[in-house]
């Protein structure tokens, strides 16, 4: 990229920029280093949990790679909110909020210090989408590297993930296991640094970074403890110099076709429903018009082929051994289900990347099926619409075999109320648990309901469904419908559901309905008034005033009159 198009010369070159250069010298930069393009290494790092515990060391490796590529790298941090530690508490309300905060923080630090290019490193659920949103917003040469998943745990010969700990609580409540066994599962479920090992939200979004073309091929699947993780981080540092040299910016890669590819990979792998929110949000920042209808359109034509937890039997480390995300993408490309002509961070097309990537010559059909012999003929996520969700709702069909469910509503106005209801055996087989006022504005922050869904599964309530305007963890399984829009707080129909109302979940017809006449729904809505907001000051109150509905990715938007 010509110097005239770089940001850093305007800030650091020339006699009048001597004060700015003085501060770069203070951190050890030489004249030669100041005269090179400056690359930001945005790193989501935190000791509060294993997901991003190791990313600071990865940042040092990425910087080494960038230096080898002739650049001057400087690292800065972003915040991290650990979803698992916040699960079922007020802390979870900050999870989705942190995604947009991360995007804002990266934008602020990048522009304030006049960087020329961006390397992003993150490990958990919101760090990947937050950094990708910033890359899309900034539209500068950018590349992402995922921090990697943890190795799976083991207990009595059974492979464990964090999902098993949550479900063990439900089993304990139901008297199926004792406190000692719960404790043993807790100690063994997550034995190393890295993200949750199943195809939960973190690994889903790591996979999306590859599928979008924003990360090096094969870089999502090695575990956080793998030496190949270090190799990919170093190569990522080198690769950003080629993007700068060729003038390739993030929006050159983040096209509508790239998002179609990402959705296809999401559907094929049975990834997290949270990816729907995050892809919509990244597209919004990239100026790409992506809608929920695009997800259903691609879901219908894309088979579900990845047997990965929670819907299947395997974890990310297993997928890595047989070829990682490129194995899935190559199968889709060969079947005509991917656009191979899109540009990627390698400077090559997706098709060229997949042709050059060496898939291990080992059996893989137990993990990744053939497109012509899939686990299910349509993708792992379905968008539902109907009288209960006029703007849409999301169900992960990869994690349930239920295609139609009809039952009476058991209504709760918060996740906490619902969890207490399950503890006290209020919920009966055949019912639909409705949890409302947990949407983007109502939560606020659209918290995940894993504590409730895991308690339902763990308690053996196999014939219970759930509908919420909140979110689900990527570890959730069962007939669980989330992201109901409009949410209760803004007067969506979910606000007027009463105990005993009949709710119908119909996956085949993509419907979510309440068995009430239009006149009765209208009458109830006319008599409805919103509750007092849970927060009237602070970050959560500010967020609630700016956030859009889940059908729009729950992005925060400025209020411009």
Swiss-Prot record:
Biological processes, Gene Ontology terms: isoleucine biosynthetic process; L-valine biosynthetic process
Domain of life: Archaea
Annotated EC: 4.2.1.9
Pfam families: ILV_EDD_C, ILVD_EDD_N
Leading EC class: lyase
Keywords assigned by UniProt, alphabetized: 2Fe-2S, Amino-acid biosynthesis, Branched-chain amino acid biosynthesis, Iron, Iron-sulfur, Lyase, Magnesium, Metal-binding
Family: Belongs to the IlvD/Edd family.
Name assigned to this protein: Dihydroxy-acid dehydratase
Organism (species): Sulfolobus acidocaldarius (strain ATCC 33909 / DSM 639 / JCM 8929 / NBRC 15157 / NCIMB 11770)
Name of the coding gene: ilvD
